[in-house]
Structure formats: structure tokens, C-alpha cells
Amino acid sequence: MKRIVLAATAAALLATNCFAESYIPFSYPDAAGGSTYLTGVRGVSGGPSDQVYISGVYTPLGSAGTQGLTYQGSITSNTGSWYALNYPGDGVETITSTALYGPNNLGAGIRVVGSYKTGTSAADIGVMYEGPVSGIGGTWTKLQVSGSINTIAHSNYGNLAVGNYDTQLDEGRAFVYNINAGSFSDLTFSGITPTSWTAYGIWQNPNGSYVIAGGFSLTPSVTGLDQGYIVDYDAATGLSSNFRAYNFGDNPVTSVVSHFDGITSDGHDGFNLTGDWIGAGESEEGGLAFFAHVGRSADGSFTAAEWLSLSYPGEGNGPTSGNTVYEKYVLGIYVPDGGVPQGYVATVPEIDPNSLGSVLALGLGSLGLLERRRLKTA
């Protein structure tokens, strides 16, 4: 995997050198040479603030299939408990891969979503697990949009899960799944009709309303202008509001692809997000991860974002991605020099609310957009 040099136009955005307070490796300890992808995080209710649930994906060395992962413990040190958690199937189909995303705290356990594959098809089929984090005694529910080729659930909160499905491989659609009703609906936006769009992150506000984050494209080409978005969602009406599109650095010329992968509250009335972006002149094999902060205006709309570019430090390291976020922590993957993808946790510096719209560099690196889960081929 080649190392990408930032285009001059993109590098010009990174005017200030600012480094994360810390980066720590955070991988499944039983990987034994395999790769670890961290995909989701949520705090443990009633516990210390550093206690979290993490979802992930583990690829055993030499295997083409994946296994789901869950973790419970501290986010500041890899000292908690890891569990391999795989969809068991219905006794008829042979399960070859499981991938888990977006855990949620149920008090006495967790709810985690994702997808699985069988030995007879390359298609992804959505799935949801509810029960102990260990997987012992829990229940599984298949999630599949009618008529879809692939269905992947990315995250869940409250009574909703969000994700993507496709009916043709070059166009993905975002869905909202009502867990209590067991029903799917398309996520749509007022005044905009994308050719392809995703829903990766969901947050439930204290008043019961939801905020969803992801990405969209107005062009049919996968190399077209992609943007991230945030939108409010009313579960009672199924309507969205306060849609706002984002380009990394607030510049669609130098950032041709921007995508939000995760969202969390900032503890006030704003949100912290993470994701990936690609600079002008780069292919989809190259780009960077980021951390972003978005506030609320007096009229309820979302503000401009403050952006921090992320890269796992180390001579010769390859790509870094931002997959999920909790408080001031970003989780994702990096590729060590000569190695396979591994998980990391980055602690980002405090946000200066007076510098919204600025871009700070947290190291420079490259990104292969590994396991982006953006439904281009899945």
C-alpha cells in the first residue's frame, strides 16, 4: 500500500501544527498476527467516564473471513475484556464472516448491529445482537431491506438503528430501522436528492430527538464530489430537518470527498464527529482521517465545523482512519510499517470555540479508507 503525499492545495489548509495529546495502540490481544478494526464505541451507563463498550472486526491471519468483536473496559488503556461475537446462523446457512458496528448500552447488556456473509453468497445481510457483551445468552435478529442486494447496519441508539442498503452496486441508500416496530424506512432530506447516501452515526438527545451523520453524493460517479452531512431526525414523523452538508476544511475544491463515520455529544449542545477525507488530486486509495466539532446556532441549525486532521505517528506507518468517536477520543485503524491494520485510540486537544472553521494538523499521513463500509460494493 503506497504512502500518499498530500497535494499542495490540501497541505496549505494545514496551517497549524497541533498534535494529539496521545495515541495508543488498541487491538484485540488474541489477534496473533491478524488485523483489528475498531468500528464503534459507547459509554457504560453508571460507570466511570473512561468505561466503554467497543465494537470491532477481527480478521484472522491468512483468513478471508472476519469475526465480530466486543470490548468492555477502559478507553484509555487496553485492559478490559474482549470477546469474539459471531452471528450463529439459523442452522441452515453456513456463516463465513461477521462484522459488528455501533454498540449501544442497554443497562444489563448491549445492543450491537452489523452484517454477516454466508458461504453461498458474497452479499452482506444486516444483523442485530442484544444481550451480554460476552455473547452468552443473547438474541440475534436478521435485518434485511426488502429487495436489497446488501444491507449493513452501522449504528444504533434508543429505538433506532441506521445503516445502508443497495439495490444496485453503484448507488447506496440510507435506512432508519425502528427496532420496536421492526420496520425500515428510507432516510430522506428536504430539498436535496442524492444519487447515493449513507447513515453511519446516530445520537439520541436528552429530549428524545435524534441526530444522524453520514455522507452523500450528488453525482453517479464514485469519484464525484462527496460531502459529509448532519441532520436532525424525528422518529415520530420520519422527517428530517436542519440538514447541513460539510467538506473538510470548509473547502469543496481542496477536499473532494468528506464523510462522517461517527458522532457523539460534546456534553453541551454540540457534537464531536470523526471520519475521512480525500484531497484534490488523490484517488480513493489516499486521504486522511479527521476529528470535527459542530455546535448549534440560536435557531437550532448546525454551525460550521472546526476540523482536526489525524494520523497515527511513526516512521513508515501507512494509512490512518477515523471510525468512531466518544467524548474527546477518536478510535480507528492505522497500518504499521510492514504490518496489517491495527486499532488505535487518539485523545484530541480541547476545542477552541472561537476558531470554528479552522484546520489543525494532528500529524500528516495517508489513508487507504480501509473497511470504510461505504456501500459502493457492499
Model regions: which residues?
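Intrinsic disorder/low-complexity segments
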Residues: 8-16, 69, 127, 175, ...
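A ubiquitous, low-specificity "background" feature that marks scattered single residues
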Residues: 8, 184, 356-360, 377
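A short, hydrophobic C-terminal helix/tail in secreted or cell-surface proteins
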Residues: 350-371
